[in-house]
């Protein structure tokens, strides 16, 4: 992000002080108030709470408009593209569709339901495609948007 001109700070819920600053609400809000993109790694460190749900919870806590889920696929498909070569990529979905459709498996239903209830958009894009996350953070069309 920083290299592409987007001011960014990474924080972690898992203690790793030599590598990354620890997440605190105050630290994250300070970075956000300065116009920086905040990336939070490490989930919540709590059992029975997926990283997907943790991401949506953090978005709520930090009053974010969008969650970017960078993953191994380049968006949401109507079925598993690894198993079905004829799977169709969906450019956008409503929250209701993402929760109701059993074929949507890129995120857990608890996270999708919480995002739906709180009207937080989710962008699903490929982690390893160069520039994807930066483009998503700048509001450019990438992957699939759920809103």
Regions found by a protein language model. Name each.
Residues 1-147:
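C-terminal catalytic "cap/lid" subdomain
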């Amino acid at each position: 992000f920083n290299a592409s001109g987007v001011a960014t700070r990474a924080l972690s819920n898992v203690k790793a002080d030599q590598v990354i600053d620890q997440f605190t609400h105050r630290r994250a809000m300070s970075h956000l108030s300065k116009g920086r993109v905040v990336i939070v790694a490490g989930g919540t460190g709590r059992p029975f709470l997926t990283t997907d749900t943790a991401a949506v919870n953090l978005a709520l806590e930090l009053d974010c408009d969008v969650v970017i889920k960078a993953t191994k696929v380049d968006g949401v498909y109507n079925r598993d593209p690894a198993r079905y070569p004829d799977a169709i990529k969906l450019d956008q979905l409503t929250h209701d569709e993402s929760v109701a459709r059993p074929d949507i498996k890129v995120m857990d239903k608890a996270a999708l339901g919480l995002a739906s209830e709180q009207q937080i958009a989710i962008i699903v894009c490929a982690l390893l495609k160069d520039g994807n996350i930066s483009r998503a953070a700048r509001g450019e069309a990438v992957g699939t948007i759920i809103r």
